[in-house]
């Protein structure tokens, strides 16, 4: 392999990275007050707790039921930690079952002409970007982190994400270059606890992350404000019924709290209308209940009748 293949970042590129020349010039301050306003939680100390565990572990996974806003929270936690809404210091990727070391770190990648080219992946690239800008914090958000095999995806870099090994160097197998995960890089993963088709995370990965469970927040100040702005009595009744539904789901021996219905289904960015409610219930909530209780159609029908009565009332 020639020298040009090994040299992913020349001096000019590194200088641009350190100056953030590709960053958004409209960067604005982002405070805990912004986080509390945008991220719904029934825990008034939510922001402080998340910041504390992120600082302590440096690698965290936000886990929870569908619709609790895991990715939304992850990005705003990054903004709050850096103090700015600066997307140039945040990278978001999504794992899937076919995601590989070559996709994430580096490797030979097929080209349109049938040849292969040696390319750096997003993790390698982002680590290098953070490394040349050590006075600022950088954040990698990994959606659906449990859909990929983390140890295979990271390869020999797997040990380097651990906080105690930040800054250490190892030799990468593809190019014999020394590589390390910088101390100013934070990793925030998200994980859907209601996905039956995924294997459990191995203990080696669990030891490198702190796990934080996000819960539905229908009683939070932020969600109550959405209901108040909508001025829709049916919306209020549906929300109360979803809270009752979540109690039933959490007590179900085959399901549990990890399968509850999150509040973000109803966070539409505008006043929630009767038509919105009908679409959410009919095409999002009910298909989910069909999946949850596929062996108990009577339960599904009972809830469908209850929601229909509210919507038609």
Residue positions per predicted region:
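AAA+ P-loop NTPase catalytic core and its hallmark functional loops
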Residues: 8, 12-255, 271-283, 287-313
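Short beta-strand-centered aromatic/proline hotspots
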Residues: 1
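Amphipathic alpha-helical segments that form the core helices of the histone-fold
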Residues: 266-268
């Amino acid at each position: 392999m020639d020298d040009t293949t090994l040299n992913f970042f020349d001096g000019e590129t590194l200088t641009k990275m350190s100056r953030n020349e590709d960053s958004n010039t409209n960067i604005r301050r982002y405070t805990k007050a912004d986080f509390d306003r945008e991220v719904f939680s029934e825990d008034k100390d939510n922001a402080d707790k998340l910041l504390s565990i992120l600082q302590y572990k440096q690698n965290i996974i936000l886990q929870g039921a569908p619709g609790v806003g895991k990715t939304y929270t992850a990005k705003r936690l990054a903004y709050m930690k850096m103090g700015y809404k600066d997307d140039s210091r945040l990278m978001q990727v999504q794992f899937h079952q076919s995601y590989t070391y070559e996709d994430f770190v580096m490797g030979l990648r097929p080209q349109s002409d049938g040849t292969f080219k040696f390319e750096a992946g997003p993790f390698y690239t982002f680590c290098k970007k953070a490394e040349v800008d050590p006075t600022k914090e950088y954040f990698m958000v990994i959606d659906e982190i449990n859909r990929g095999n983390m140890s295979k995806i990271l390869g020999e870099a797997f040990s380097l994400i651990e906080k105690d090994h930040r800054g250490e160097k190892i030799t990468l197998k593809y190019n014999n270059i020394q590589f390390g995960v910088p101390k100013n890089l934070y990793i925030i993963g998200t994980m859907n606890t209601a996905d039956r088709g995924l294997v459990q995370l191995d203990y080696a990965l669990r030891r490198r992350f702190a796990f934080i469970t996000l819960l539905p927040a229908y009683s939070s100040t932020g969600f109550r404000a959405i209901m108040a702005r909508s001025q829709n009595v049916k919306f209020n009744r549906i929300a109360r019924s979803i809270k009752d539904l979540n109690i039933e789901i959490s007590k179900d021996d085959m399901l549990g709290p990890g399968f509850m219905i999150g509040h973000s289904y109803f966070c539409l960015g505008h006043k929630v209308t009767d038509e919105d409610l009908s679409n959410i219930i009919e095409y999002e909530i009910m298909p989910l209940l069909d999946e949850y209780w596929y062996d108990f159609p009577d339960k599904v029908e009972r809830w469908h009748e209850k929601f229909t009565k509210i919507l038609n009332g």
